Amino acid sequence: MGIINAEKLKAIESAMSHIEKQFGKGSVMKLGDHNISNMDAISTGCLDLDIALGIGGVPKGRIIEIYGPESSGKTTIALHIAAESQKKGGAVGYIDAEHALDPSYAQKLGVDVDSLIISQPDTGEQGLEIAEALVRSGAIDVLVVDSVAALVPKAEIEGEMGDSHIGLQARLMSQALRKLAGTINKTNCVAIFINQLREKVGVMFGSPETTTGGRALKFYASVRLDIRRIDSIKQGDSIIGNRTRIKVMKNKVAPPFKQAEFDIMYNEGISRCGNIVDVGVKEEIVQKSGAWFSYGDIRLGQGRENAKLYLKENPEVALDIENQIREKYNLPPAELFKAAAPEGAKENISAKDDVAVDTKE
């Protein structure tokens, strides 16, 4: 690297000293004066998604956007991130603009509802003011806004049905993100904005889908996750979950456009054991021979559901497999978890009764 001459260095030092006097210590600095460490992240609770994000989860101090069609799992992902943060002693704020949070479902996903800070604002302005106050406190580790589409401007609420309010919500979001972005970074908070899809009228080529709230969130978000339900998971005639795919559409902290696939089981959330089996097979840590799954000398079971059930009943084996996968991708090791087997689960599910993924549209 070239060396800056003495006169330039003196001028820079003088300018920096003047800036610090005017704006305070820390307002300007040399990047090399501070330890550059790997970016801190909060796990998503899904091994495959942590790998796809490149840093082991969602980055701290950044804005995250999760969007997709209805009932695709957007809130489930946000609640899993909240639960993972709480496990590490983090505080979570939840702006429930849709007024639709189910506390019992959140509890099943591992969220400590007693310590969850929740607000159900009357207007979009109120919701974003509360969000800013929580972030500015410096005590919130994860803030979830559910959803951007439900942040209705005050003028629209007080107006008549049928009144035109073009661009009001976009202006509201643009102003809010300008104010929030710097504070979120300084307080090392993860701000998750859940968003809905709309369709643009008259689009002939390309996707007509767009997200609500204008373009500001697309620019300010460091990570954008497109979540889709791709299949139904059946046991007999009953649908017991969804097969879900997430595509990382934007990523400022790692290479984008990676994908993750996993099961979201009803009343359970993301199937951690199912994810370990899938990624383990892909990475050849778990061996699959016909319908049988094995890990070294340990036979996990015949059929994917038996393998999942074995890992639920033997969390030490699941942890060992997961940490081998994490080591391969330079991710921090996982801690021991205990997941009880589902109520009424048979000790050995035959391969014939294995849960099937319905590929019909």
UniProtKB/Swiss-Prot annotation:
Pfam families: RecA, RecA_C
Main localization, broad class: cytoplasm
Keywords assigned by UniProt, alphabetized: ATP-binding, Cytoplasm, DNA damage, DNA recombination, DNA repair, DNA-binding, Nucleotide-binding, SOS response
Residue stretches of biased makeup (Basic and acidic residues): 344-361
InterPro entries, sorted: AAA+_ATPase (IPR003593), DNA_recomb/repair_RecA (IPR013765), DNA_recomb/repair_RecA_CS (IPR020584), P-loop_NTPase (IPR027417), RecA-like_C (IPR049261), RecA-like_N (IPR049428), RecA_ATP-bd (IPR020588), RecA_C_sf (IPR023400)
Keyword Nucleotide-binding: yes
Record's GO cellular component terms: cytosol
SMART domains referenced in this protein's UniProt entry, alphabetically: AAA
Source taxon at top rank: Bacteria
Any one GO molecular-function label of the UniProt entry: single-stranded DNA binding
Segments forming a coiled coil: none
Region ranges (Disordered): 342-361
Annotated residues for binding of ATP: 68-75
SUPFAM superfamilies documented for this protein: P-loop containing nucleoside triphosphate hydrolases, RecA protein, C-terminal domain
GO biological process: one example: DNA recombination
CDD domains (UniProt xref): RecA
Metal-binding among keywords: no
Cellular localization per UniProt: Cytoplasm
Function (record text): Can catalyze the hydrolysis of ATP in the presence of single-stranded DNA, the ATP-dependent uptake of single-stranded DNA by duplex DNA, and the ATP-dependent hybridization of homologous single-stranded DNAs. It interacts with LexA causing its activation and leading to its autocatalytic cleavage.
Family classification: Belongs to the RecA family.
Name used for this protein in its record: Protein RecA
Organism: Clostridium beijerinckii (strain ATCC 51743 / NCIMB 8052)
